[in-house]
């Protein structure tokens, strides 16, 4: 299977059905396919070929999806570029990826202009007009590029074509994780059709007929990826899964989460699936639902069937609050990373929610440092290993590839760095990233466990926990906390609140209050920035 080939077959059978919505823009599957084919022709005309890297430096929108699809069509490799990156970060990623083309929003053009002279491999610059100044010499307007090229004829493609997604760089410099296109496409096809109540097709040739039948029955996935498409959660769960099942991807216009915009769109487009990133997204949605009810204009969320989250903690309390307001929901909490998928938990009304406890994928294991498999109920801590569709490796980094992607007992695994125990029932109890573990007074403390406890204290809105060098303890547990508007929790109250839930040594030694806890656009914790807040406050 191959993303582009599957989507072409879908466009052939439901061409008049909607594929993409962004504000007033609506693209049918035929239009989506044609615009992507024009973009593919532009890439080829500029001298790009199979395996050429194409940077996507954009916010969510139809152009992101079209430019990506166009890259897949000509067997290129679209590369996600974080729209928060400033000059040096942008240069690093485009240089590291060997990018030959860059599609970018004009509001980001000033950054592009300052680095483009240091990127000699770039052959094509395409600027998407979003009201920015447009300052990049040699850049071509996106719509003019499409108009200036006939659609590229369809071609055959290989399942071992490379799909690549760059990591967020939370534990070092961003790295390109390379997968086989066939395995990636097949995995997401398997995930999508069961959401329609259909058995997953065993072969690509079955997809078009299944999609056509579902569309004729009015059975389609209508998705909002609330997370950025430049991250795996947004593009994999929020876009690839619905599109591979012939669905609709509806993107938000605001560039930071506006829960009211999201809920208005759920109502207007009869959205069935929502992709978020844990509590950071779920809490504002809950507040917006409550405010709308209080104002006498509740949102119609009756179409919404599933909320999917991945990437950060989604606590049991917040899941329960969401189900109290939208009772028909299925909440799917996935554990994974750019390097692999490891497990999930499913919560519905009447099924007790949990935090950081997941059913393992059949190919997931937990291994100790000496490569022994952790047994259920043993209490041992090990590193989570994801089997199944394992990446080729990291682009241009064989040493890190050898450390992360290893063979144990004849099976190849990915070790993204997550520590876990295995419960008596075989489920994973996720403890957190090994690189974030705090060693205080000889005890290992997992930040996520403390963060969850802090967030239960009255008045706390958000929290990250870091270790700060300390003469007495080695590292002092330090909570970086933001409060709800109007709340007045004190350091002592927060420390006491945690001690009422966890062993005393896990409680913060210090609490640093900030107006906003630092997180990436996808809701993931920015521990580097949080640690700097803590250092600045305790200097």
Give each language-model segment a name.
Residues 185-226, 230-275, 288, 292:
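Conserved AMP-binding/adenylation subdomain of ANL enzymes
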Residues 85, 91-92, 100-104, 387, ...:
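AMP-binding/adenylate-forming catalytic core of the ANL superfamily
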Residues 128, 503-525:
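AMP-binding/adenylate-forming catalytic domain of the ANL superfamily
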Residues 148-168, 172-173, 178, 212-222:
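Conserved pre-ATP/AMP-binding loop-to-beta segment of ANL
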């Amino acid at each position: 299977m191959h993303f582009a080939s599957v989507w072409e077959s879908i466009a052939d059978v439901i061409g008049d059905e909607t594929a993409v919505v962004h504000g007033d823009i609506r693209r049918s599957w035929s239009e989506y396919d044609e615009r992507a084919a024009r973009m593919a022709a532009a890439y080829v005309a500029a001298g790009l070929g199979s395996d050429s890297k194409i940077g996507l430096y954009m916010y969510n929108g139809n152009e992101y999806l079209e430019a990506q699809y166009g890259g897949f069509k000509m067997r290129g490799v679209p590369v996600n570029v974080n729209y928060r990156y400033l000059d040096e970060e942008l240069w690093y990623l485009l240089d590291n990826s060997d990018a030959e083309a860059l599609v970018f929003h004009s509001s980001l053009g000033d950054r592009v202009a300052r680095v483009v002279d240091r990127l000699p491999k770039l052959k094509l610059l395409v600027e998407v007009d979003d009201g920015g100044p447009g300052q990049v010499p040699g850049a071509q307007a996106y719509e003019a590029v499409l108009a200036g090229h006939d659609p590229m004829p369809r071609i055959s493609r290989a399942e071992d074509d490379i799909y690549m997604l760059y990591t967020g760089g939370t534990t070092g410099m961003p790295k390109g994780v390379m997968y086989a296109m066939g395995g990636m496409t097949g995995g997401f096809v398997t995930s999508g059709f069961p959401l329609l109540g259909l058995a997953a097709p065993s072969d690509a040739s079955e997809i078009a007929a299944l999609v056509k039948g579902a569309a004729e029955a009015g059975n389609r996935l209508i998705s909002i990826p609330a997370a950025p498409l430049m991250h795996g959660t947004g593009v994999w769960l929020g876009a690839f899964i619905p599109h591979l099942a012939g669905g609709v991807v509806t993107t938000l216009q605001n560039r930071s989460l506006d829960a009211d915009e999201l809920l208005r769109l759920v109502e207007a487009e009869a959205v069935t699936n929502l992709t978020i990133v844990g509590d950071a997204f779920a809490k504002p949605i809950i507040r917006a639902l409550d405010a709308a009810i209080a104002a006498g204009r509740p949102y119609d969320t009756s179409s919404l069937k599933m909320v999917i989250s991945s990437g950060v903690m989604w606590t049991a309390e917040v899941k329960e609050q969401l189900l109290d307001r939208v009772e028909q929901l299925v909440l799917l909490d996935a554990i994974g990373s750019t390097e692999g998928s490891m497990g999930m938990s499913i919560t519905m009304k009447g099924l007790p929610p949990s935090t950081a406890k997941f059913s393992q994928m059949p190919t997931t294991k937990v291994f100790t440092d000496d490569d022994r498999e952790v047994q259920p109920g043993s209490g041992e801590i090990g590193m989570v290993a994801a089997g199944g569709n394992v990446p080729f490796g990291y682009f241009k980094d064989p040493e890190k590839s050898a450390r992360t992607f290893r063979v144990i007992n004849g099976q190849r695994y990915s070790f993204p760095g997550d520590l876990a125990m295995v419960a008596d029932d075989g489920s994973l109890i996720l403890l957190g990233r090994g690189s974030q573990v705090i060693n205080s007074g000889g005890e290992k403390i997992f930040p996520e466990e403390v963060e969850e406890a802090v967030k239960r204290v009255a008045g706390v809105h958000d929290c990250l926990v870091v270790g700060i060098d300390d003469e007495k303890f080695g590292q002092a547990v330090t909570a970086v906390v933001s409060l709800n508007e109007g709340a007045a929790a004190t350091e002592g109250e927060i420390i006491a609140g945690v001690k009422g839930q966890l062993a005393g040594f896990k409680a913060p030694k210090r609490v640093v209050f900030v107006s906003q806890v630092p997180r990436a656009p996808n809701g993931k914790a920015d521990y580097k920035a949080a640690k700097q807040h803590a250092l600045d406050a305790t200097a």
